[in-house]
Amino acid sequence: LSVSSTKRIEGTKNDGLERRQFLTLSAASFAAALLPLRSQAQEVAEASFSFDNLVNEMRQLAQSAYVAPEPVEGFLADLDYDAYQRIRFRPEQARWQEKGVTFRLHAFHPGWLFKEAVKINEVDGDAVAPMGFTTADFEYDNDDLAQSVPPNAEMPGVAGFRLHTPLNRADVFDELIVFQGASYFRALGKDTLYGLSARGLAVNTGLSEGEEFPRFSEVWLRRPEPGDTTVMIYAALDSPSVTGAYQFAVTPGETTVVEVTMRLFLRKDVKQLGIAPLTSMFLHNGADKGDFDDFRPSVHDSEVLVLNVGKDTTLCRPLNNPPRLASSYFGAENPRSFGLAQRNRDFEHYLDAQAHYERRPSLMIEPMGDWGKGMVRLVEIPSDLEGNDNIVAYWIPEADTLAGDELGYSYRMHWGMNPPGATSQTLGRVVRLRSGHGGVAGVEADTETRKFVIDFAGGQLSDMPSDAELEPVVSAQNGEIVEAILSRVDGRNEWRLVLELRAEADAIVEIKAVLSGYDRNLTETWVYQWINA
């Protein structure tokens, strides 16, 4: 399985020029590499831009064979990890610095891993024109490197872009959203730090056919007016199997909302199309410590998959770092929302003074319109490094996705500390999960069974007396429930469910538990996959 991310990139030495050779490239050779590039400044388009026009263009493009993008050449192609890390966009070169405009645009330099340049255009009223970027827009933080770069040399495009806005303070333009690499992007709500990412589309993730990574090949940004609180972004998506037109309406806030409208056109049959895909990292926590000898009790960007199926039905699926590639599927029809949440906001839960995992955003997807029947798929990939994104989640439509199909989806993305749907306001929720060997304390462990301890609190449970008639409803597929005991935790407004299970070696056990009473479910439904490896 190949899962990439713009969040953490582990660099390797370029297989071409050595670093010393690279730094001695002459300004003339750099200029020669860029000379064949067309002058974007001379390409001011006379035609008007609209999302409908983009949709029609991508529909027509799907009728022709896929043409792979040309990689960058010369100097840009030879950038290695060390050099790329020394290149920064100059803040004073940010676009849209006019008085009263609350958004700023920065670009990412092409090269290194980002060898396919992305065209960036600006829409102003009905007119559209390329946004040209040159070497003067970037700072090259090394004397030899800087001297090898000619002034004002025009770029063939960029690796991506980011938008800034006064998100946390009125006098500071903080990062808001980043688009970089394939169709990856990520955003921030107030007081959060970058964590999980999203993608425009997932194609055959974790399947034998091999995963395909569509890319945003061209982007249009509508020039914001003074006082605008929403910025509009449009993107063309292209790959061997599919083309697409995307519209993003980005509204920053305590919870930043990105409203997405997408139209897809299939060139080929696609075995599994992933709509609104999310990518995150889960290394370990108190329930799944694995073999990690780590002073930090928990290391993760997200801890649970949340699926709100109906008014009173919420599934809570704690994430795993499994011993082998694992998948879970959750069927639904027109779900209210789904996403990956970081629920625990206590520093003591993580104890990481640099990464501050307690400030990583949750991301909930709110479908708009009729999504029909389908399922949410959760993919969990074994990982031994927190630099690897090993969690993927997305919606799979029930119907086959075949060549010639045209599909349309709209949804809202909610990025923040506690976005709508991440935590139920009425149902009790899972506040703690621990697991270990079976048996009781003080005697020899029962290695034939596995114990799961799930603590519920909040919602309707807050009003329940200690003698309330609550009942655990528990099931286990491919496993045997040896024991299920529910009790109230003395001195705390929490209810503890203790499960003990037995399963065959190497069995994949799907467990489900919910607390009910008074003819209704009182908590979200805890679901879990235990691999008895």
Residue ranges and their predicted role:
Residues 82-85, 90-95, 126-130, 256, ...:
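Primarily extracytoplasmic ectodomains and periplasmic/lumenal surface modules that are beta-strand-rich
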Residues 118, 231-233, 244-248, 258-260, ...:
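Hydrophobic residues positioned within well-ordered beta-strands of beta-sheet architectures
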Residues 82, 154, 177-183, 187, ...:
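A contiguous, surface-exposed recognition patch within enzymatic or periplasmic domains that forms
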